[in-house]
Amino acid sequence: MSAENNNEKNTQELELWERMSTTEGAERAEVLDELSHIAYRRDAFNECLQLVDTSIDIYFKLGMDSHIKELIHLYEGKALSLRNLKRPAESADTFEEIAKFYQLDDDAVGYLRAKRAAACDWYDAREWQKSLDGHIAAQVAIDPDATPMSMGIDLLNIGTAQIKLDLHTEAVVAFLSARKLFKEAKNPEYVNWADQYLAITYAALENGPEAKFHAKHHFNYSKVAEDMSLEGFARYRLGIAHLLCQEYEDAERELVSALEQLTLDENKDWEEILGANQALAKALTALGKEEEANIRLERIATIAETIFGDADAA
């Protein structure tokens, strides 16, 4: 940004602060809103929150019913600031409030957008049941703009929350329905997402053949897309499926390859790496290679304790 532009922005902000001393009511709330935009653009999210909250208070004193659109706008700024501050539970709560305002304003599209945003943030806050409830609410609501993609994404989100709640049978139903919708939308990337989650869910249900079917599709996509990072995850899922099917040599081959690829990633997914090592140890043990399996488990013990908090793992 040039010095001239920066000076213009500083001048604009100073003028707005000066107006604060001469305004009241709705005009004052509007000035606070403009100042919050300036704070947001320079990543001053705490300052933005303070300005937004003050503006919100004014509108409530003036009468909520006559200022719903202004309140929606302000609450959206508040939610986005909270997201940037990594406070997902608070941003989720704020999006829930936004959804209520949209209902009062008879805006079905806005309501759905806010409910979906709240559900996603509840997921980030590890509030799995609230996330599931939110995504189900979005799914069952009448959506005038519904498409196979939007319906599929709702189901995908429902399934991921169900996995966290150990509702694996229910998650399978959601993912299969999502997969069908993504195929209808001719979107191979999202069909792949459904296959990935189906491989995970069927494995949790110890259904080896179905886990292998979807893991193979997940793997095929990673090869066609030439995505090495994705291929590592796909090989891990395929290895787990082979293990469940008692195909131990195939499991060993896929899990060894998976680890070669997963460990190359700069931002390592330690939970996946540990899971692949533990699965590989099971395959090795089944193949009579207990010493090799034990060595592998000993090597990951401290990392496992660090990630999972297992005091016995160190």
Predicted regions and their residues:
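C-terminal non-catalytic interaction modules
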Residues: 1-15, 257-314
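Residue register within tetratricopeptide repeats
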Residues: 10-11, 46, 89, 129, ...
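Amphipathic alpha-helical segments of tetratricopeptide repeats
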Residues: 17-18, 56-63, 96-107, 136-146, ...
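Residue register of alpha-helical TPR repeats
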Residues: 30, 69-73, 113, 153, ...
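Tetratricopeptide repeat
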Residues: 48, 54-55, 91, 95-99, ...
